[in-house]
Amino acid sequence: QMFHVPIEKIAKGNPEYSLRQKGKVATLALGYQGGTAALIAMGALNMGLAEEELPDIVQRWRSANPRIRDLWYAVEQAALTTMQTAQPQGIYGLIFRYEGDLVYGQSFLTVQLPSGRKLFYPKPFLQENQFGKMAIHYYTVGQQTRKWEVASTYGGKMTENIVQAIARDCLAETLKSIDRMGLQVVFHVHDEVIIDAPVSITVDEICDLMAEPIPWAPGLILKGAGFESDYYMKD
């Protein structure tokens, strides 16, 4: 899509195969509004891409994925409008609210997910960011300092928070279904579920379970894949 080349031409032996690496690193780095810096952080220069190529790759990826790009801006605008008006904003099954706790004097920007669960951004306020653009700021615990500090966010970053949270909620539905079958979930890692099951339980049964529709996500296509092993390992 990015390079207007049929997918079957991107095969070893074809000159178009050189586009594969560009597309791969772009997909990894640009899905949540990343730019040239994100490409470099993902190792684009070490993969043989020239720095002067990167802005074009960013623009090509965004042009090839307009719905993803538009989602970043819709999320950002909903969050900003919520903060500016203190009125709830609803988009794509999400509800943005500015909420307060009168007992403890706390305030939050919240995003209600399709599952009903909420994301919380503590003590939010509007302020220009380092690019001179009005942006949402909030308090968070710094990864390095482990202390409360102010962070700014933007549409792509909030989209990442939302997408990963929804993915977690989908996995949680599967965990509940597995539990209802009487099977033991030993642990789970990101999008993987490790089950200690009798030999009579097949991988296909579990994969079918993971593909079952979720009531709060009608139309969402789900698919599972798995394997059997005597101990945990990567596929």
Predicted regions and their residues:
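Conserved catalytic core of nucleotide polymerization and phosphodiester-bond processing enzymes
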Residues: 1-235
